[in-house]
């Protein structure tokens, strides 16, 4: 160690000894300005054999004991380095030289496990529950939660203990080693915002080394320190990962990502589910985000203006909208209370696929209208109405298109025309559709299997042409010919054209009267 | 909102259209209006101008991040209208203001920023009334502030040299945006209120209900740009404050999506940028100096304005306000999750692919953040429930499935975890960790050895692709074979499996020579096969690799005891205990060794120490405690004299013994109900489980923070693990069945008895019962029946239907000479656990005494089938055969017994847990 560093450290040692009680606070504030002190102290800790180690450890402990938050944080910043020092010495089975570091670690631990009154500290927190109102929400507006046992048990807020109470420890044994170290890391993580960059770097290095020493990856990382394996526990790794996460997002991108990879590697080898869980989550959540290394001191977070409208197209069936679906059933559909109806009416549900949205023009089941005359104009877009959700690929649908027979189209269209003329002025499709379905009591009338056998055609215009071409209708055999190979798993036909959609004009609904008339 | 008293229906209608954004109706209404009064012409101009501008903006929406380009021909008309309205000056003052605002907006759209700013200064935005303003005007004012902010941003500084003025300008811009955001929120709330009132008022004819209002460029900017600037400037405190303000406002349909995004972003910041010490809760003022902010910029932390009307916020009594960054993050994430769940795209047709991806991505992020927040606090049970809800999104998505599997594993739901892992293997067949995790679970509590073998074979079949996991795969299959060998009932099968296990372990060790686990298990397997010297060599190697591994040390001690070097073994145990002072398995072995080496008094001292340790570890109330601290446990612990010197006056008299014991068991369940609630904390050293990498086979598996362990797992583990402690070597599959029977019986029994039910997880009580039974055994060795009875009774209070307890009762009876009673107890024990070899052996001996030789022979032969290395069984069998006159067979048995006894450890090797 350079003489200069030694001098700095010695000066620091002597300064504090002569300090009075009252001047402690100012001294703490002034510590920040001593730029060369912290690196010098790091050097002392790294070289185990320095004689300054003992007085330094003692002084750091005094800092911690003083209770002044700044001084405590000053001590805490060295924690990763101290832990590494202790672990590496233990692994090398070097009995001496780690005594003072052990004493320091145990001292901090014993101080932290009791609160001001000397009682054992129990760290707990409240698990929020959506069923209780909070400053950010009201329970009624959030949808009903699943009625699981867990949800019932959590009804109301529960305070849960996550650490403690702990026993005082006099020495390190193999049994309590990781309990103590995990708790110390917990304390360290509680003050992460105050830790400087060098401390975070040291944390990342600790994580890397602890994870890979003695494993094949050590060759990859080319770390030449110790070569025997260090035992770790799952909770210890979880606390390390928590710290690494903070470091990753606050400037230490390279070291942090390496450390995270190494810890995950170790967790995989040891089959620790907790560490894998949190590590994978961090990795996946940072996947898209580009983290640039910021300069020291700047902690800017990238935030963009997000569009307030939902980006999901209106046609996609979502959990919310599926409530309003009618399923293929042979009995009357039960749609629940009228309240639900109005709600559904407000919700954008639906299966109307956009003509424009998809890359390939979606196959449409056009039960379209253009019967001549009055219904013609209205019929134009009716076809976009009836669609079907299936799980099959569009290829099959294309095949179906080709196999379309005019007959089916015809029959349906005729019926559709009739229905349409009834419903021409109705603009709120959903409501109507639902009310219509409710008023359809005929059993079996909702056999959408018939509509299921509807024909696909590529475009609405084609169909209307076809339709106008084949006037005579043979209505006979339509229900039977089921061209569609797709099995209809009870997906409803819901004709539905969202009024707000730009590409469509207001179009009439084709209610399921259609099928019932067949 | 108080509606303005409007004179006519027409005006109301106009107001309504303006509020709801139905600009296409305006021209018609204007025509009707101008038919009425001439003076309304100006108003008509104003309305037309506004309508046209709004329609233009609707058709050519300004995108975020782009700047308006310049004058547009279509907007000429608008300008004409507005100029007409303004110039004539006949309008009422409010309408004049409105006209100016619209004019300013037009100027912005045409990129004439200075003019817009002029307009705003003329109007003096700050003085426009919010209270009593009609709904549309709120929107106008909000947009005006936003536009003003935008203009200020775009206009370059007049004199950029003064840094103060830059800061001031920034502050002004931010204030504009913040005001705009607040008023926009207020406007949206008012609109929703009006709409819902309107729906009720009007006849329910189906009219087009504008479901979601589009916010438009200006309102969106106003809502969001403030915090964007805060974050860009590094002012996290104010950014977070702004987020919170937006979230605290009562939600409306239009803001739902925004709230979801903001909630998630705020949760991200709380988890990534804040720690517990730098947190302040939403209801208090932000700290003056926070490490979160950029130290180079000094911006004021408090708002410097106050609006006359504010948006409604969530309020009430007992509102939950988070006190910690994790709590707040959890709350926000739960809110965000419920919203994201609603938007889960369920349809699977390819045209909805993009939608699926979008909803998956946003939900995935929310679930990842939930994992991070809950993982920090060890709440894996809740996490597994949340991740189950994520399954809606998870079709063919490996990440979510895997996370679910891991969370189930961490929460202790092993059976489900294995099933989910199967699905993960299907989704990602090339990843060796997944089958290894499955094997770990199968070998643990579940004891699904067939499945385990299949999973392990998957890893082995991967060959080189598994890279560093190959050794682990061999290790896993070796363990499976080893456990199968222990389970097997035919000797031939046992040997075959043992051979397979050995070769697998050897392969593992050769693949990864620095892994002490492979070497250790090789040693263990050799020990089980009674190849003691080789086992010793390997275990020493293992200790060289990892010097303080508790199981290696234990195995070493057992091996030394097998070689009859009891003192050396005891030394090793004591050394191990110095590193693992609260490890009960080691302590049990110590008791046994001390009984042999140093005499039973020492052993009793150890028992007493164990009781002390137990009491300090598990700070629980003994269920038989009558509340006065007078239980035997407390007295034993408090008594300084050695246990054997203690006179137990209550128990020395056989008559009063039963009375006293019943008084103990019949004591009213006054034990202060240990709150089952969250304040129960798991015992710190967690004795043998948890912090060790391989949790003890006898106890629950590895999740240390599990609070409410599923009751079904533990008793199984206990009861068949308990076997191993008392000396039966097998961890039999049948003993698992026995343990289930015991559990059922004990539940029934405890409901009949009046003893208080045990609180919390069972393993502390199991340990306590084991300690008592060990003490009883030592007393039996000393010949002290009364004390032995007392100890057994203590154990019986805890687990009355345990076959170990029954066995011990039988032994006590034997000691007292009550052969019939002993026989009864043994038979009861066997009915619960038919493969308990020790019981079988003693029963066989009794039957031999009673001269029922053939029955004795049968029972002893069965025992030998179960465990072919039990030398005392062989010995007894030899005696029985001899008594029957079958000398040749008897000789064979005796020889076998001698051989086995030569290498018999003090406790069977199988008490050492075999887990991955």
UniProtKB/Swiss-Prot annotation, chain A:
Please list the residue ranges that the record marks as compositionally biased, kind Basic and acidic residues: 393-403
Residues spanning the signal sequence: none
Q: Where is this region: Disordered?
A: 385-410, 466-492
Give one Pfam hit by family name: Hyccin
User: Which residues fall in a compositionally biased region of kind Polar residues?
Assistant: 466-484
Keyword hit for Ligase: no
Looking up InterPro entries in the UniProt record yields: Hyccin
Q: Which residues cross the membrane?
A: none
**Keywords from the UniProt entry:** Cell membrane, Cytoplasm, Membrane
* Chief location: cytoplasm
State any GO CC term. plasma membrane
Location(s) in or outside the cell: Cytoplasm, Cytosol; Cell membrane
The biological processes this protein is annotated with in GO are: myelination; phosphatidylinositol phosphate biosynthetic process; protein localization to plasma membrane
State whether it acts alone or in a complex, and with which partners, per the record: Component of a phosphatidylinositol 4-kinase (PI4K) complex.
Q: Which family does it belong to?
A: Belongs to the Hyccin family.
**Known function:** Component of a complex required to localize phosphatidylinositol 4-kinase (PI4K) to the plasma membrane. The complex acts as a regulator of phosphatidylinositol 4-phosphate (PtdIns(4)P) synthesis.
Q: What is this protein called?
A: Hyccin
Q: Which organism is it from?
A: Danio rerio
Q: Please name the gene that encodes this protein.
A: hycc1
């Amino acid at each position: 160690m350079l003489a200069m560093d030694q001098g700095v450290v010695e000066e620091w040692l002597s300064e504090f000894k002569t300090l009075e009680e009252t001047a402690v606070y100012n001294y703490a504030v002034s510590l920040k300005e001593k730029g060369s002190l912290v690196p010098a102290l790091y050097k002392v800790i790294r070289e185990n054999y320095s004689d300054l180690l003992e007085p330094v450890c003692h002084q750091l402990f005094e800092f911690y004991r003083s209770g002044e938050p700044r001084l405590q944080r000053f001590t805490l910043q060295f924690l990763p380095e101290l832990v590494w020092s202790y672990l590496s010495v233990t692994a090398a089975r070097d009995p001496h030289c780690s005594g003072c570091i052990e004493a320091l670690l145990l001292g901090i631990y014993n101080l932290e496990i009791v609160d001001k009154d000397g009682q054992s500290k129990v760290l707990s927190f409240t698990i929020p529950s959506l069923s209780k109102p909070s400053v950010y929400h009201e329970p009624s507006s959030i949808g009903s939660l699943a009625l699981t046992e867990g949800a019932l048990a959590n009804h109301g807020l529960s305070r849960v203990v996550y650490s403690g109470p702990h026993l005082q420890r006099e020495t390190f044994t193999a049994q309590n080693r990781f309990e103590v170290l995990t708790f110390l890391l917990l304390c360290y993580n509680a003050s992460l915002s105050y830790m400087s960059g060098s401390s975070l770097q040291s944390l990342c290095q600790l994580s890397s080394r602890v994870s890979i020493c003695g494993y094949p990856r050590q060759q990859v990382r080319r770390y030449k320190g110790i070569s025997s394996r260090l035992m770790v526990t799952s909770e210890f790794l979880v606390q390390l990962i928590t710290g690494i996460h903070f470091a990753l997002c606050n400037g230490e991108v390279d070291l942090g990502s390496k450390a995270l990879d190494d810890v995950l590697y170790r967790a995989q080898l040891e089959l620790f589910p907790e560490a894998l869980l949190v590590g994978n989550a961090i990795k996946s959540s940072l996947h898209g985000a580009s983290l640039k290394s910021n300069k020291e001191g700047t902690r800017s977070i990238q935030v963009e203006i997000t569009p307030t409208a939902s980006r999901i197209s209106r046609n996609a069936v979502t959990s919310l909208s599926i409530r309003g679906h009618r399923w293929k059933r042979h009995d009357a559909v039960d749609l629940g209370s009228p309240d639900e109806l109005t709600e559904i009416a407000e919700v954008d549900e639906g299966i109307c696929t956009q003509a424009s949205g998809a890359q390939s023009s979606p196959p449409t089941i056009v039960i379209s209208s253009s019967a001549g005359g009055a219904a013609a104009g209205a019929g134009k877009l009716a076809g976009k109405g009836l669609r079907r959700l299936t799980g099959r690929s569009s290829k099959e649908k294309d095949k179906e298109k080709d196999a379309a027979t005019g007959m089916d189209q015809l029959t349906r269209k005729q019926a559709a025309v009739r229905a349409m003329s009834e419903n021409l002025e109705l603009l709120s499709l959903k409501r109507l559709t639902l009310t219509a379905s409710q008023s359809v009591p005929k059993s079996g009338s909702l056999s959408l299997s018939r509509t299921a056998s509807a024909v696909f055609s590529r475009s609405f215009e084609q169909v209307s042409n076809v339709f106008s071409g084949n006037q005579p209708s043979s209505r006979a055999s339509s229900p039977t010919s089921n061209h569609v190979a797709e099995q209809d798993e009870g997906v409803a036909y819901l004709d539905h054209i969202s009024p707000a959609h730009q590409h469509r004009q207001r179009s009439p609904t084709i209610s399921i009267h259609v099928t019932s008339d067949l | 909102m108080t509606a303005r008293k409007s004179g006519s229906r027409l005006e109301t209608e106009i107001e309504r259209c303006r509020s709801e954004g139905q600009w296409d109706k305006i021209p018609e209404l204007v025509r009707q209006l101008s038919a009425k009064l001439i003076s309304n012409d100006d108003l008509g101009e104003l309305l037309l101008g506004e309508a046209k501008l709004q329609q233009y903006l609707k058709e050519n929406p300004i995108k975020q991040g782009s700047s308006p380009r310049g004058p547009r021909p279509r907007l000429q008309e608008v300008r004409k209208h507005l100029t007409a309205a303004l110039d004539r000056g006949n309008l009422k003052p409010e309408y004049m203001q409105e006209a100016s605002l619209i004019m300013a907006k037009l100027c912005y759209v045409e990129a004439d920023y200075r003019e817009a700013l002029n307009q705003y200064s003329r109007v003096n935005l700050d003085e426009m009334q919010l209270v009593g303003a009609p709904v549309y005007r709120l929107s106008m004012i909000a947009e005006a502030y936003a536009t003003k902010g935008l203009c200020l941003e775009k206009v370059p500084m007049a004199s950029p040299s003064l840094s103060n003025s830059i800061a001031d300008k920034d502050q002004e811009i931010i204030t504009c945006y913040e005001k705009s955001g607040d008023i926009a929120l207020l406007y949206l709330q008012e609109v929703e209120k009006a709409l819902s009132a309107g729906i009720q008022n009007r006849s329910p004819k189906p009219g087009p209900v504008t479901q979601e209002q589009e916010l438009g460029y200006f309102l969106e900017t106003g809502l969001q740009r403030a915090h964007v600037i805060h974050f860009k400037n590094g002012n996290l405190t104010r950014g977070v404050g702004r987020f919170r303000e937006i979230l605290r406002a009562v939600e409306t349909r239009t803001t739902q999506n925004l709230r979801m995004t903001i909630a998630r972003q705020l949760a991200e910041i709380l988890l990534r940028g804040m720690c517990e010490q730098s947190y302040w809760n939403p209801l208090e003022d932000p700290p003056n100096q926070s490490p979160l902010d950029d130290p180079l910029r000094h911006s004021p932390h408090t708002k410097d304005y106050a609006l006359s009307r504010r948006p409604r916020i969530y309020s009430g009594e007992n509102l939950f306000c988070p006190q910690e960054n994790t709590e707040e993050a959890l709350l926000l994430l739960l809110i965000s999750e419920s919203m994201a769940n609603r938007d889960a795209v369920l349809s699977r047709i390819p045209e909805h692919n993009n939608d699926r991806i979008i909803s998956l991505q946003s939900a995935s992020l929310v679930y990842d953040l939930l994992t991070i927040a809950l993982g920090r606090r060890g709440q894996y049970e809740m996490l597994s429930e949340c991740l189950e809800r994520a399954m809606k999104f998870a079709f063919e998505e490996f990440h979510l499935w895997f996370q679910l599997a891991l969370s189930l594993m961490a929460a202790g739901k092993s059976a489900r975890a294995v099933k989910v892992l199967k699905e993960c293997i299907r989704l990602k067949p090339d990843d060796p960790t997944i089958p290894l995790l499955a094997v770990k679970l199968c070998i643990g509590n579940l004891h699904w050895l067939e499945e385990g073998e299949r999973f392990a074979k998957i890893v082995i079949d991967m060959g080189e692709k598994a890279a560093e996991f190959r050794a682990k795969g061999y290790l896993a299959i070796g363990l499976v074979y080893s456990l199968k060998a222990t389970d097997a009932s035919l000797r031939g099968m046992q040997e075959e499996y043992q051979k397979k296990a050995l070769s697998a372990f050897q392969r593992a060790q050769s693949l990864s020579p620095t892994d002490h686990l492979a070497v250790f298990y090789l040693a263990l397997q050799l020990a089980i096969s009674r190849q003691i010297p080789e086992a010793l060599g390997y275990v020493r190697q293992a200790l060289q690799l990892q010097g303080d591994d508790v199981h290696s040390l234990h195995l070493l001690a057992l091996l030394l005891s097998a070689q009859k070097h009891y003192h050396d073994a005891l030394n090793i145990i004591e050394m191990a205990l110095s590193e693992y002072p609260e490890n009960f398995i080691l302590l049990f072995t110590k008791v046994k060794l001390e009984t042999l080496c140093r005499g039973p008094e020492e052993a009793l001292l150890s028992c007493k120490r164990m009781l002390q340790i137990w009491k300090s570890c598990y700070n629980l109330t003994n269920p038989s405690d009558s509340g006065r601290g007078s239980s035997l446990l407390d007295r034993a612990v408090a008594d300084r004299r050695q246990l054997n010197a203690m006179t137990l006056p209550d128990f020395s008299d056989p008559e009063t013994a039963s009375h006293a014991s019943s008084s103990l068991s019949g004591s009213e369940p006054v034990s202060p109900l240990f709150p089952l609630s969250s304040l129960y904390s798991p015992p710190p050293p967690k004795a043998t489980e948890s912090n060790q990498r391989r949790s003890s086979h006898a106890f629950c598996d590895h999740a240390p923070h599990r609070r409410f362990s599923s009751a079904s797992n533990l008793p199984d583990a206990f009861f068949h693990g308990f076997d191993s402690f008392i000396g039966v070597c097998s961890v039999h599959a049948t003993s698992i069945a026995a343990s289930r029977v015991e559990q059922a019986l004990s539940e029934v029994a405890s409901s009949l008895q009046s003893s208080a039910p045990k609180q919390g997880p069972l393993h502390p009580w199991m340990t306590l019962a084991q300690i008592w039974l060990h003490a009883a055994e030592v007393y039996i060795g000393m010949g002290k029946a009364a004390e032995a009875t007392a100890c057994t009774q203590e154990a019986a209070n805890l687990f009355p239907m345990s076959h170990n307890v029954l066995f011990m009762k039988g032994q006590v009876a034997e000691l007292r000479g009550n052969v019939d009673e002993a026989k009864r107890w043994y038979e009861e024990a066997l009915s619960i656990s038919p493969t308990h070899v020790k019981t079988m052996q003693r029963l066989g001996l009794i039957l031999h005494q009673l001269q029922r030789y053939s029955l004795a022979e049968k029972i002893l032969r069965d025992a030998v089938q179960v465990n072919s290395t039990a030398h005392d069984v062989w010995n007894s069998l030899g005696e029985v055969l001899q008594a029957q006159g079958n000398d040749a067979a008897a000789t064979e048995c005796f020889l076998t017994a001698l051989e086995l006894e030569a290498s018999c450890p003090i406790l069977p090797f199988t008490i050492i847990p075999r887990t991955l």
